């Protein structure tokens, strides 16, 4: 039995970490191609941020908004031949796009998340969408980012919703890794996960339960606290290592299914993954104590527990079945669950999860 565990080359986290970005880039050379969110460029770093660089010349390009094949192709055409390193600065889709551009051009990549809303930063994976925002495919990359740099002072100033969504994404990590472990299903490398991966996935879950509420309060006050540092690490590093080396299963497949309904597109990745986690609890018949624990956590930090909270109030059975069918595509990770799963199973699990969430809110 061969197991494989993969990691980013270097993980840097802390208040003020952005101030050592040039130092990290200079290890790769003198020319950097930067893909950055427009909002981050203007309002977080400032448009003149790179003008203070003395060791590295920067070719800065604004991200178009969607991690699509078209955007990857557009940006790749703007990279100068002598570029030494590609840099992604912003949210998950910006980072995934930068990783894809670096892969296409065979360059090292440095990832700088400005929100802790997904576990995308550390992974050797880009999630590709259509230009309209519908999930298209996973792009598996041959290597993880060379550097992931997270400035928690920047994260603390972002709206709390982003950190909470990151907790929703991270919430799936242990449940999906545990399913893969039980089934001997492969992780994202195509091989089995290691003891290390499963332990990190469990640590991720425990950290969320222990520090999630305190971390949310910290970002609401725009303060960097030990609780925030722990949750940023859980959302970014632990979840990234856990999902990639532990494996994905139902929760992310259900997220992908939800993207077929346009009303969900304005909601964050982790918000939809949280619904996938809740549905998976009923899909895999988890003990009531665990179901209560997960719903309570979601309610405390502000994650959605009903379909209405991700834009699907009054969703028809026909549309919900479309979600279930997409989630059960033959190439989806839902087939890493220990038992066979059909679209009808997912349909009923979604309805059960929604009903339970509404019951707890006294809506039924």
UniProtKB/Swiss-Prot annotation:
Disulfide bonds: none annotated. Glycerol binds at residues 119, 169, 252, 269. It comes from the Bacteria. Keywords: Glycerol metabolism, Metal-binding, NAD, Oxidoreductase, Zinc. It catalyses: glycerol + NAD(+) = dihydroxyacetone + NADH + H(+). Pathway: Polyol metabolism; glycerol fermentation; glycerone phosphate from glycerol (oxidative route): step 1/2. Binds 1 zinc ion per subunit. CDD domains: GlyDH. NAD(+) binds at residues 37, 92-93, 114, 117, 123, 125, 129. This is Glycerol dehydrogenase.
